[in-house]
Amino acid sequence: MSIRKCFLWQISCVVSIQLITTVQPLAAQTASESERLQKLERAVELLQKQNAELKAEVNSLKSKETASVPDGKFKTKVTYDGKTYVEKAVVEEKKVPVYVQQAGSEIKLVLGGFIQTNFEDGNVSAFEGRFGQTALKDRFRLRRARIGMTGDFAQNFDFKIEGDFEQNDGTSPSSRVDFSGTDIWLNWHQFPEAQIKLGQYKAPFGLEQLTPDTTLLIIERSNTTGAITPDRQIGVELWGKPFTNIWPEQKDLLTYYGGIFNGNGRNINNNDNNNFMYVGRLELMPFKGKIFGQESFLKLGGDVLNSRDDAGTNISQSGNLLVNSDGSLSSFVLPGADERTAWGVDAWFELGPFDLIGEYLEEYVNGRTVNGVPPGFANFTTDGFQITSGYFLIPKKFQAAVQWQYLNPGQKGNDGIYSITGGLNYYIHGNDLKLMINYIHTWSDFRQANPEFGQDEFNEVIGRVQVMF
């Protein structure tokens, strides 16, 4: 018999004896009816008090008995004693939850990333001049697979560190998937009007280039952007919003950027020479509000760039600029020293579900003779534009987009490349989960003027799945 059962039996005996000893004297007495009732009431009160004390003791014993049984779920454990298998229920130990704690004193730490996977069919990347001797084959492509972390310190510093498991075509040292740094920077933001950012990130030049990869209306950026803008560089910049405190309602009215960079690309710590790339950008938002009850804005921008580069520097970081003998394009790696000067203007107008974006870029590439060594190429001017429009057929869900782009490399007569893109975007869960499909038709002026090199019009279909986390 268990301790609990023995104790309950003792309680029953005590209660029974007390009832007998209390009720019998009451029955033998000859007192008045009221006195007998009073005695019965006192006896009942006494019994209730004793019963409450006994219940308290029973509960105490129950809790002790329960505490002797380990916490957790039971699982079946099978043992073998040499003759038979024995099954026994044993307590499964609870697992300690996994957690991550930052080593520093950040007040904010966010881990995230995104994956973009492409299907590319037809004349793959013909809009980038990838035809003829630089043609690519139909493929599935891991376009971007990035993971990064951002943080914020109470001492007015924020930072970002991000890496990518894929590279743009032509920038990877091998044909395999690589991992390399993209954004790695630290920003001091105590004064919103004058912030200091240093590390590796996109130099502030070009609206389409500075638009995040995950929010583009067209799957790929125009080749004009890729060929002329400097993309990611290592350096430092001063930037800010001058009206943040003096005119908070119009803090986005003006934003300025001014930076100094090595000028020879990302993930390269050694500068190509003792000169730097100087980049500046101004953004003006003269209007932000409602038109016809729709959220709207107008943003204008302008860029300038100057850089003195040595031989071996790639001056088309994420696009193709060098005109080959058959009119196709490839990355422009300088055979000798140069000095580049570039500028651009852009505008973005949004009216509810409608977006209209336009940008023009121009660059002058002039050779320099260094230590008696000629540059090895003729001076040239390259320019181009892109105009992009988007409209939500179903608000926030289904969007149609179109883009017209043109690049004039300026190295051979009639070497321009035009492309028109039509696309559909389905936002399953905003930009976090998005499907995109584009059809691109491309014309080559050089191929049209020189039909002996083959076709001068090209078609491509690109599909993309995007997941952000």
Protein language model features and the residues they cover:
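Acidic-residue sensor for enzyme active/binding pockets
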Residues: E33, E41, E53, E57, ...
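Outer membrane beta-barrel
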Residues: V96-N306, F380-G410, D415-I420, S444
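Outer-membrane beta-barrel pore domains
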Residues: T134, S172-S174, W185-H189, Q200, ...
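A general secondary-structure boundary signal
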Residues: L37-E41, L47-L61, E65, F114-Q116, ...
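Bacterial N-terminal signal peptides that target proteins for export
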Residues: S2-C13
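Low-complexity, intrinsically disordered short segments enriched for Gly/Pro and polybasic residues
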Residues: Q10, Q24-P25, F74, V78, ...
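C-terminal segment of classical bacterial N-terminal signal peptides
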Residues: I17-L26
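N-terminal periplasmic/intermembrane-space "pro-region" immediately following the signal or transit peptide
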Residues: L26-Q116, N123-E128, P248-K251, F469
